Amino acid sequence: MIFSSSSESDYQWYYKFRVVEHNIKNLETESNNSESSADKVKLNTTYNGIMMLDDEDYYVFTAPTKVKYIIKAVNTDIDHYYSLTCALYNNSYKCLASTRLDSGEGWKKIGTVSLKKGQKVYMKYSSYDRNFCYKLKVKKVS
């Protein structure tokens, strides 16, 4: 790629670019912007999400057994002090837990829920900040 100056000095700059593709496992799918289009989450699997300006991302977890589950998330942004709101809802859209994840906080518990086999919990992630990434995970409570 060559960039040239528009001035009379006739400068030219030569640049080489290399594009490397990196596949991210368990990346959210768009459009997961509502309960009806929520991405399905499996137990003990880390999921990656990309938060965009005025974005809302939904996930759903269906309990494989009757037990308590803990939902954790991390805001992976380290440079901009962006925040992310995380909320857990049941089928009736009743809020079970809610918290804010700030840049640099590390993994944080969103909530602990007792679910029967087949019951669902919805996770809503939202932000009014610019683009950044986050991760989430559901585990059984020991």
Predicted features along the sequence, with ranges:
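Predominantly extracellular/luminal regions of secreted and cell-surface proteins
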Residues: R18-L43
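Short, hydrophobic/aromatic-rich segments at coil-to-beta transitions
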Residues: N44-N48
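Acidic, Ser/Thr/Pro-rich low-complexity intrinsically disordered segments
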Residues: I2-K16, E21-N23, I50-S142
